[in-house]
Each structure stands twice: as structure tokens, then as C-alpha cells.
Design a protein with these regions (language model features):
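Residue-level signal for the nucleotide or nucleotide-sugar donor/cofactor binding architecture
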Residues: 29, 60, 121, 149-152, ...
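Flexible mid-to-C-terminal extensions adjoining Fe-S/redox cofactors in radical SAM and related proteins
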Residues: 245-336
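Short secondary-structure capping/turn micro-motifs that flank functional sites
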Residues: 22, 57-58, 86-87, 149-150, ...
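Radical SAM enzyme [4Fe-4S]-AdoMet core and its adjacent flexible, acidic
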Residues: 93-100, 105-239, 244-255
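Residues that scaffold the ATP/ADP-binding catalytic core of kinase and kinase-like folds
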Residues: 12, 16, 90, 112-113, ...
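Conserved alpha-helical substructure of the radical SAM core
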Residues: 1-98
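Short glycine-enriched, charge-decorated loop/helix-capping segments at active-site entrances
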Residues: 20-28, 115-122, 184-185, 301-302
Length: 336
């Protein structure tokens, strides 16, 4: 479950899933509204919460939100996504007793790296934020967005995470290729295929984290799980199938004025819950269909107007599962 507690942010990052015009003039939801939403989340037995934005640390009451989620609602796993520019000792001190994980987005593995996403390199500030987080006794985590211009930097990012003593996962940049300003950041099929191999060979230890999958996290599924295994609440209370599908036509309801149960019983929820990758274009003939689940439906909409279109990052997943299949076969042969 993603919960966007503010829409305000002082950055304009390429491919940001929460960017919208006028977001910095939008009023933050009240603490009372947020508590109501957290009560709804808790009532559904949701065990993992990601507090996002905007930039959550722009809210002075962020520690109060975390305390309510953890101590009153009993949500066991909580992560805060941050751009890392507003981490302060006072907030960290108030957060430290509630065991959150604070994930900092990096746009480069060194101070000399070009900031393709943010436009301005803040590497030293981000490293300092990670160190402050760890000094406060809070789990730190790095999120690096992979795109065409840094796809060869995966190992350097892993080295950085090990040097700082934190976990890491990688997100994949996603937006339409029709925008001439961002089209150059979209990886080619061959780059994605190579990336699938690189991520597989990193192994489960280096990829373990609160948001990232490991090579052992494999299960059968019909689709990506949007509106069923994942949900996202916008800063105005609107519920969407996932954090990358904040579009009006996919609004499921509003937890500030209604229940989460009603949102999960909406027409939009049923639309997603009836998706089946075995009926998706190209997926039906793929031997990895039942463990891939057709990839990400939000990414499919970046290249096509239909939810049943192929995920444009399919080459990455094919390579990953090819290597998984090979390794599994070798393991069984060794046992025999």
C-alpha cells in the first residue's frame, strides 16, 4: 500500500510517478484525514505501508503519522520514500522509536555522476542523509532509477550501498516514448535483456530490501496484482490500483470520505482483478507467463492504450527467468 501524504516537492524529476501540475499549491491532507485512512488500511489487514509524496519530510507531522500507523494501527512494515534533501535530526529522533525504513532516491553513484533524472547532482547531501539515518538507529535504503543512460551503473550502485551499509533496490523509469525530452532515457530491448542478466547475477543478498524483489521471490500469478495486492492512496484520499496509475479513469474511491472496502468493490477494482496474462497480447504464448504475470500494467499503458498490451520491459523479465530456469535445472540435476 502506497500512501501519498503530500503532493508537495521541491524537485521535478523525469519519470516521477506522482508529478502533477500545481502540486506545490495543493493543501496537504489534515492529520485527521490521514488517521482515518490509516484506520481503513489497518482494518483490511494490510501489513506493508509505503509513505510517499511529494516529499514526506516537508510535513512537520510526519513522525506523528508514522507513530499512528505503527503504534495505533499496528502496521508492522513501514517505509518512507524521500528525495533525501530534507532529512533533519529532529524528525529522525522522533521517528527512531517506530522502526521505519527510510528510502533515499539516488541519481548517480558518485558526486561526478550526471544527474539525468533530477537535473542537479546532490550526491554528497544524499550520502550525508543516509549517514544521519543510520546514526539515528533507523534502517536506511537506496533506490536507484535505471534508464538508458545509466544502465551500465548497476554494479557501482551496489558497491555504493555496501560502502554505506544499507540495502538497495532498482526502479525502472517508465513514461511514454512520445515525449522528445525523455525518450532518450528509455532503454532499448537489448539493454533491457542485458539488465535482466545483470540483476539476476547480483544475487538475492545484494538485492534484498523493503521494495525490491529477490531471485527467490517467485510465485504463480495471473497479473501484476494492481487493485488487489497493491493499492495507492493519493494526497486527496483517492484510491488507485497502484502508485503508477494515478489517473482519473482508474479512481476506485476515496478513503477520506468513504471506506476502503467500497473502493475494493468498485468497477475499477473488478476490472483489474479480472485481468489474466494468459489472455494478454504475446503473453499467452510465453512459457514464463504464469510466473511473470504479464509484467506491469502501468508500463504497458506507457506504450499502448490498452491494459492487455505487452509490458515494454518484457526483455528484462525474459532474460531473468531464462537464467532462473537454467539455475533451477542445474540445482535439481545436482541433487539427483
Amino acid at each position: 500500500m502506497y500512501f501519498h501524504v503530500t503532493s508537495r516537492c521541491d524537485l521535478t524529476c523525469q519519470g516521477c510517478y506522482s508529478y502533477k501540475e500545481g502540486r506545490n499549491s495543493c493543501e496537504d491532507p489534515s492529520l485527521e484525514c490521514i488517521k482515518k485512512a490509516l484506520d481503513e488500511i489497518s482494518s483490511r489487514g494490510i501489513s506493508q505501508l509505503v509513505i510517499s509524496g511529494g516529499e514526506p519530510f516537508l510535513r512537520d507531522d510526519l513522525p506523528d503519522i508514522v507513530a499512528y500507523a505503527k503504534e495505533v494501527c499496528g502496521i508492522p512494515s513501514l517505509a518512507i520514500l524521500s528525495n533525501g534533501l530534507h532529512i533533519d535530526q529532529s524528525s529522525l529522533h522522533r521517528l527512531s522509536g517506530h522502526s521505519p525504513c527510510i528510502s533515499i532516491s539516488f541519481d548517480g553513484y558518485s558526486a561526478e555522476s550526471q544527474a539525468h533524472i533530477r537535473g542537479t547532482q546532490n550526491f554528497s547531501k544524499l550520502v550525508d542523509s543516509i549517514k544521519q539515518i543510520k546514526s539515528a538507529g533507523i534502517q536506511g535504503h537506496i533506490i536507484a532509477t535505471i534508464h538508458a543512460l545509466n544502465i551500465e551503473d548497476v554494479l557501482q550502485y551496489v558497491t555504493l550501498s555496501k560502502r554505506l551499509g544499507v540495502t538497495i533496490n532498482f526502479s525502472l523509469i517508465s513514461f511514454t516514448s512520445s515525449d522528445p525530452h525523455t525518450a532518450g532515457l528509455i532503454p532499448s530491448p537489448s539493454q533491457l535483456y542485458s539488465l535482466g542478466g545483470a540483476l539476476f547475477h547480483l544475487g538475492s543478498d545484494s538485492m534484498a530490501g523493503p521494495h525490491g524483489q529477490t531471485r527467490l521471490n517467485i510465485s504463480a500469478k495471473r497479473y501484476c496484482g494492481a487493485a488487489k495486492n497493491t493499492l495507492s492512496i493519493d494526497s486527496d484520499g483517492t484510491v488507485y490500483p497502484c502508485h503508477m496509475l494515478h489517473e482519473e479513469k482508474y479512481a476506485m474511491g476515496n478513503v477520506f470520505i468513504d471506506s476502503l472496502a467500497n473502493a475494493l468493490d468498485s468497477d475499477v477494482a473488478r476490472l483489474f482483478q479480472q485481468l489474466d496474462a494468459s489472455r494478454f497480447e504475446t503473453c499467452s504464448t510465453c512459457k514464463y507467463c504464469e510466473i511473470c504475470g504479464g509484467g506491469c500494467r502501468a508500463r504497458s499503458l506507457c506504450s499502448s492504450p490498452t491494459l492487455a498490451a505487452p509490458d515494454p520491459y518484457c526483455p528484462l523479465m525474459i532474460r531473468f527467468f531464462e537464467l532462473l530456469e537454467d539455475e533451477t535445472s542445474r540445482a535439481f540435476c545436482a541433487v539427483e
